Amino acid sequence: MLLAEARWIGKALARVEPEKLSPLLNVGSGTAETREKIQPWIDREIFAPLRQRGVAIQHLDIQEGEGIDLHGDLYDDAFVARLGGSGYRSLLCCNVLEHVENPAAIAAKLERIIPVGGYLLFTVPNSYPYHPDPIDTMYRPSLEQFVQLFPHCNLVEGAVQNCGTGWDFVERNPLVMFAKVKRRLAGRTEHGGTKGTASFLPWLFKSFKINCVLLRKERGT
């Protein structure tokens, strides 16, 4: 997650009363180390303010790890059904849908977890380089296309957030960029078969843009 994206999320959630958010399920959370040390702005801009407002948070990921409260596969219907019966009032899912084979199917499952009147906040790349975790399908919808994934929700607010360029990212965290370049040089290929490193070079001066949407569920699924 990029800094400008985290700030947008934090500000959007700050405009919703805490009792309408709690408990919140953070889908694709990563570990506590990721949220608090590798990308500390995630906790600083999003989760620390929520905790201060009394919002209960549960972190969900497909893997186990420190700071992950729940782990499971979103393709497992029984697991998703259990989540739907857990009483969550809101859901956060950032930069996950580009890493699944069928983003529409996963979006529909996540929409069902939250009851009518609850809130869902999603982000997904709009214009962003290839980044496998473990795959990247290069799903890069427009904001309008993204909102259409959630037919039972109304858009509260949305934006295509400009998050800087690759050069900005190099200046902020060169060690992370070096690791990414090293991985691409090892021969990872992006969707369609183009070498990742070669395709990344234009992004040094091209804007990273992220679709950010806050939705309110208005209709039952």
Predicted regions and their residues:
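Helical cap/lid subdomain of alpha/beta-hydrolase-fold lipid enzymes
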Residues: M1-A4, V27, K195, F205
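Class I SAM-dependent methyltransferase Rossmann-like catalytic core
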Residues: M1-L21
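Short N-terminal helix-initiation segments at or just after the protein's N-terminus
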Residues: M1-W8, E33-P40, C153-N154, G158-V160
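A structural signal for well-ordered alpha-helical scaffolds and beta->alpha junctions
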Residues: L2-I9, Q39, D43, Y139-L143, ...
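Hydrophobic, Leu/Ile/Phe/Ala-enriched alpha-helical segments that form helix-helix packing faces
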Residues: A12-V16, L50, F150
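Short, flexible hinge/linker loops that cap or flank conserved catalytic cores
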Residues: P18, R51, F205-K206
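Conserved SAM-binding loop
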Residues: S22-P132, L143-V147, L215-K217
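S-adenosyl-L-methionine-dependent methyltransferase catalytic module, highlighting the catalytic core
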Residues: E101-P115, Y119-T221
